[in-house]
């Protein structure tokens, strides 16, 4: 059966980190890398965490779902992630031959029996050299994904559905769409590479 969704510091942090990274990528692809690098990412993360906390509290009737020390711990982990991201960004996201198709790209696909598939794709990038699309799902994780998480069909099937329905919605052949997770670890360890 389906469980009831409850907000937590993990969802608040994940949403906030998504918003900051997506803003960075939007500026990077639509303007310049230099402008993206000049963004005050640390302040943006703090602002998004506070905003998302306030919104969750409004929506849940004021029920406290995380403590101040959790917010501080996650924010400090976020600072390390942003530092890592700025250093390693070029390994994962390049402007040379790539264009940003969209951020939070909506999918609204009609299925049989009056069922709709509705979702949002975190990032879509077009490779103009190879004429290919890349659907990227940003995941925040406490310690990264082990082989079991990588093999979890619930996780991988989501991206396969995005690929299927995005391709169908935009008349793009499936063999021209790649899917990829961009996993950012909340807990970083010395001498451990991503």
Predicted regions and their residues:
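C-terminal, charged and often intrinsically disordered regions of DNA end-processing helicases
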Residues: 1-11
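Short, hydrophobic/amphipathic alpha-helical patches that form generic packing surfaces
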Residues: 1, 15-26, 164
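Mg2+/Mn2+-dependent nuclease catalytic core
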Residues: 98-194
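Residues embedded in well-ordered secondary-structure elements
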Residues: 6, 67, 92, 112-113
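Hydrophobic (often cysteine-bearing) scaffold residues that line and stabilize catalytic clefts
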Residues: 9, 13, 17, 74, ...
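A non-catalytic, helix-rich entry segment at domain boundaries
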Residues: 20-103
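Short helix-capping/linker segments at secondary-structure and domain boundaries
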Residues: 2, 24-33, 168-173
């Amino acid at each position: 059966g389906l469980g009831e969704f409850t907000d937590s510091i993990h969802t608040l942090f994940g949403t906030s980190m998504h918003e900051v990274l997506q803003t960075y990528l939007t500026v990077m692809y639509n303007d310049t890398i230099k402008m993206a690098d000049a963004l005050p990412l640390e302040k943006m993360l703090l602002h998004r965490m506070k905003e998302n906390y306030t919104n969750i509290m409004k929506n849940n009737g004021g029920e406290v779902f995380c403590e101040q020390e959790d917010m501080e711990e996650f924010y400090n982990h976020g600072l390390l992630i942003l530092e890592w991201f700025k250093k390693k960004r070029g390994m994962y996201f390049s402007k040379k031959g790539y264009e940003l198709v969209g951020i939070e790209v909506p999918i609204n696909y009609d299925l049989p029996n009056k069922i709709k598939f509705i979702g949002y794709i975190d990032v879509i990038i077009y490779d103009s050299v190879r004429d290919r699309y890349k659907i990227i799902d940003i995941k925040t994780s406490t310690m990264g994904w082990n082989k079991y998480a990588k093999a979890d069909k619930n996780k991988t099937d989501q991206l396969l559905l995005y690929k299927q329905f995005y391709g169908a919605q935009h008349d793009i052949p499936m063999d021209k769409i790649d899917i990829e997770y961009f996993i950012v670890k909340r807990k970083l360890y010395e001498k451990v590479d991503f």
